[in-house]
């Protein structure tokens, strides 16, 4: 199905009714979790920019040679580079796609999009949020007051301009987005998938509710008892979740709130390499850092202990008074 | 005055931007100069300035030397009053809780429209730019200040693509398109400060930066400029402004 | 069998309701018998039954002797997996995450429509009842079980007012009204257990409670009843069921 | 304005632009706070049923003789009795109005509504939630999939049935509700109005964002430093809030999550008295418990130390392991 089509309520309900939503343990390996993402799927990605990006799972998808994904995320940075450059995504649906303010445009994105072999489907940030939210609410659209008048509106005929029957005002109705699968990285969750997210939550709660399946990667798996002691700290409920993978430093080299900041030396070297040559530079990066390591921990050791410790020190300093 | 030769273009841009913000305001700041300028304003006697970030933050105090690499990083939340979802912080703009949106710009036109999506034909672009982010939402929903580098290729008569609406085609076209609230009211560059004509909604020079001539501004602009009747000359950055700024950004991350 | 004379109408209603719930299901339970029956099911070997409450609770384990006075009280959140906004927990129904909605009823008709708003003319009611609460939402969005007292004035051919839709006027009228999902599939009373015809969507008796005759059920019903071809007789409450129930509600708050 | 009319965007924005939303101290007395609620206003009430009801403020509104309010709340219990019986509200907009499952119908509500001197405007619970949410989002409506087909729909022509332009499905558009003022009771907030809510939050966040002014009553005023140490625990941001009142046991005789449960002996005596005679019984209750005491603390002493201690013991036991 084209990534901008709205699913009928009957389809949404049928797909959800088929899922095993019961309270059950869902812990799997990173390899098994990546196997739940199949070629051609629409994949919603949690976090934003360089924060709580489910990098380990993206890394594993590239290693497994997944193809023709349509990936959606509120804001995309080097994860988008890897999705395009690693050959797994044909389309990225987002509001912003660059390597970050420190490095400017993504040469990798430019290379693929300007050549026309990959697509970047652009929405406003609020529109992305309301698309996930509509999906999570089980309604086909939500109304917003932005994108109107701009050239983004004609670029996205999937959204519909609309005269409000209450006030006569112009509004834009943005279509629900219900990805086939969402991949989200969290600080901690239990074996059932009840997840706590510290600090910035971005659009992850709406995304988890909207998607037709959810894979959580987590820094730590905690007991269900610990979750039940503070039920108002649970951000994603277990029945949305289909798989749980414990991956310490699973957002590296991006950050995970309160635990580690981005590993900037690795990022800077990456950017220099792929911007110098978005094809060969990317290939060399993938060979060394994605296809090369035996497992995620070996990837971390390529980033290096010094970077990991420094990023952790910075990350934990959030809680300094 | 004695410091006039001792600041960069980014520095005067940041200092003038900080001056545009008042204590007590709620300012939604983009990454780069806006974040830095709003933080500078807080440190220059406006501690009641509330900064909102797109990542989902209300009322942050960014720490000196710890500028965040985006508005979605944990550094943006330091000593914040509230952290919330990123769609929810944008909805605060839609509801009307925010006084000022404050963004950088890649390309602007005579009606304050901003382009951050495409150079050339959108169907076969010469350059695919990063895109809207929250830019379209901020400019659609809030009174806005734009801070940007002044170059001829950035100040054009008509942008290739309106990512973030200013006054569209001038007059009432913005309101007619369904955007009755907000609109860009200041553009700040290293050469001058601009406003918009209340009727035509076309950009006009309000004041020249210290040492800059009207001719110089026109030469760096891709369309004929209007100058306000009472064009003034801006006071140069003070030592306090520059020193505080350099304390905040010692590595010149945003002020190189 | 030996306990047949030793339970109240509320008790058999609760026990039979608990039996209708399976381990692993997600059950959205209303206050009173539904809450108690779902809690009973958890205690009778179905600990993987997840109870949701309208106050904004997922996966609570209500404590024996501490039954909450509504589904919006803190007692509903004891050892829950998640607490969230009350609109948000109802949106889980709309999205389709919940297996079963489980409510009490004041008045029901042959198509499973429930009235909890008005007795008599809504413009000048004889009795203004409490209203929908989440009842309309639950019955509109989810497969539903209703547990209620069996009285002639409560089991009527047509309710005075449809607060919570069953199958409206039967056949496809529910789907045609814009409610393609869910619908009431069981009604449990102290006399019998009911289902609905797959085509006409009219109520029918599936099984009689122990010691209850078909005539007795008909006599307490305000319209002619259909009996399923294979009407069975329900097993009476076991001692374990009754003892566990009395442990949960020692003050007979909901089982008087 | 009729309570079901949707405000135009221009009006909403103008009203909000007039408010002083800056970071400033807002601590006032209960008497002063009640003065911000003026006759004829639409008042949104936080909490639900018997939980976190802003009882002290309602009590003070009755004492001050406020009149002709239209009050909205997700679910109404004895607070609704007092609003009708105390003469302050002419209309209550809610989804459910009774004294509670333990006591059944509200004879006070029945008395006033069946006689026609007061109005109970009924919506489904989800519809109430989406009305506040639309109000908080700055949009004129939100779509829902309930109320359709029922007799609630023709009862509420303020909502509009609608054919979805994306899927062709029937939906109901429920109109935004932007009360003139919201009154919300919380466990703690700072002097600026940054509020933390423990446990059940009901519709309070949407309500706070939707209303054109917000009065918080709080069990405790904490320092802004304490708020800033855990910014992801703030549920209502300061710029929504216009007044802060510290009122320990401000939800009595209802409950406040984690602090005290309902004071059941007082509630039972109340119910027996007003159900026996919804006019004279209510008058006697008001004379003794609302008009009689010098201040809120004296009202608490009428409830009695034994009840307060027992309710607190039960309330705090939520956090027992």
Which residues does each PLM region occupy?
Chain A
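Conserved alpha/beta enzyme-core scaffold
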Residues: 1-321
